[in-house]
Structure formats: structure tokens, C-alpha cells
Amino acid sequence: MYPNLYYAFRDLVGVEWKFLRFVNSFGFFVAIAFIVAAMVLTAELRRKSKQGYFQPTEMQMMVGQPASLSDILLNFLLGFLLGYKIVALFILDNSATEDPQAFIFSSLGSWPAGIAMGLLFAGLKWYEKNKQKLSKPEKRTVRIWPHDRVGEITIIALVFGLAGAKLFDIFENWSDFLKRPADYIFSAKGLTFYGGLICAALAIWWYAKKHKIGFWHLNDALAPTMMLAYSMGRIGCQVSGDGDWGIENPRPNPYSWLPDWVWSYNYPHNVNEVGVPIPGCTDDKFCTQLPVPVYPTPLYEVIFCFLLFLVLWFLRKKLKVPGYIFAIYLMLNGMERFLIEKIRVNNPLDILGFHPTQAEVISSLLFLSGLGLFLWLRQKAKTAKPAEPLKNN
């Protein structure tokens, strides 16, 4: 396992760059997942725009204005934070940056680097605005298509997704949270997928309504994108060993063609530092492995969800009713997660004598919601007048 990129580069390339301790493997793959998802979503929204499913919105903006004081101060602040914390990882003593997460949330940093980066960012903003300055600023009308807003959609999904994932993890582990609330809030660990999905979905719904983006067509474009992003994000879970593994599986591998680490795995050097000491490990951290191998469920989800992405990607041009792809996504997502929960470690709930996990409850609701939505959309399509196109919002 590689808790962060420092250990990955040390093992794979043979270099020891201390600043790479700052980049968690899980966070790295989540970032890659968001970037790839944004690219796929842009391509799909552009395709739908060419087919006439989306229309642009117009907005007026002032051009040719010089940089305002708020522009300069905001960029100075961003540059200062980057220099004070991130650049400091390169130049401060190793003892100060040995634990990157603790360092980021501490008051430690480099004032000279912060001020220098702040001045650089502020200067670049002033130069950029001054270069575009007109003798007389003017108001122009611009047309913005949905695919032009993918950057904003991605940021909204990231912010609300992470917040929702953290909140749902806190609810799922409420007793542990009460014992050490600060650790839970500021830790990079502990993220619940469905919490992120629900909160991000609500935020994107509000954004689409605000900017008059066809809701069902947007969801159809998001469906394969989210499945692909989830698959790629689970690579981070597997590589870092963040605790999202399965139940114990001490049985020997019965399949000669299947690698042993696919059948069961003990997650050495896992980021949660769970398990027993690894013989011969001399690192200060991440020197544990599980005493009994478990099902590597993140790896299974990487494979299964990528296959489901291919299914959705194939169907997106075959199904013409707006919302069908999204409904199928809900059903496939719910089914996949419900099945994987059977071999996953989770805290069970107590509901009327039954003990499902939070993910099993939500995945069941997702499947039923997807099924109900599909049937409703099909009935709506049947009763729609032939000359009247089905509304997409």
C-alpha cells in the first residue's frame, strides 16, 4: 500500500521527496477522477447541445476594467496561503513537515514564502487585468452553454460531495465522533460515498435550476460520468488502504487463474495504520498490516463500476427518453453497492429488529427510486402527444 505519494515514488522510482508526503494517495486519485469526469461530462454536454437538447443562456459582463482592490487582495491571500503552507513543505525542516495533515492544520508555515507568493499572485492578476484594460470599459453580452459551466459544476460537486461524505461518515460513526470530534472533522480519512452523492446531487439540482439547464438531460450526461469517477476514486481506496475493505477471508484461493491478492489481501502499510506490526518495517508510520486477509472490495468496485460505466456509455445514444439513463444509473448503482455490502465491513443500524448498514439502506432506496423513475418516465413518454416533445426539466 502507498498511504501517500512519497511511499509510492520511493518504492517505484527510488527517490525520496519529502514534500510528496503531503499528497495522499486517496486524494490524488479522487482529484484525477474529478478531472477525467469533467472531461467526459464536457464532451457529453457538447454532444447534447449539438443535438438541440440544450440552449445557451445570455449574461452581461463588463470588460476592459482594471484590477480592483478586491481582485488584488484575494489573489494575494491565495498566493500567501500557497506559499505559507505548500511551498513551506519544500523548504522547512523535515521535523516540521513529517506529518503533512497535522502541518496543514497547524499555525506553522513560512512567512517569507507566503509573502513572496502573495505578491507574485497579486502582480500577475494586476498584469492580466491591465493587459486587457480598455480606455472605456464596456458591457458585453455573452452566450454560455452548459458545457461552458462544467468547471463550476465540478467545483460544486467537489465541495458539496466532500462535505456530504464527511457528514454522513460522522452520522454513521456518531459515538466515535463524540469521543474525538476534532480528529473526525479535520481528518482526510472517513468519507461516505452516498453522503457525497446525495449532497452533490442536491447542489447540482439547484445550480441547474438557477441557470435553466435541462434537468433530465443534465442527469443523463452525469450518470456515466459519476460511475466512471466512482470507479477511479475507488483506486485511491485500494492503493491507500483506507479501511473500505471487506470482511475477513482467510480461505485459500480456489482459482488457479486468479492472483492471490485479488482473492484476499492484508493491506500492508495501510493509511489507517490498522493491524499488527510488519516485521522489518523501519518507517516511523504506516508499519502495520491486517492480521487476517480480507476481501479487497475497493478493487472489485473499480472493475465492476468501470464495466457499468461502459454499459451506460453504450446506452446513452440508444435511449431517447430524457431521464432513462439516469434512472438506470440509480438502479445499477444501488444494485452494485447492495451486493458489495455483503462482503464489506460496516457498522450495522438497528431498524425494527433488522440490522442493515447505512449503505444497504440507501442503495435499496436508490434502486427503488431508479425503478420508479424509469416506470414514471416510460408512462409519461407513452402519454405525451406525438407533436409535443417530452420536456427535459
List the model feature ranges, each with a label.
Residues 1-393:
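Hydrophobic, membrane-interfacing alpha helices
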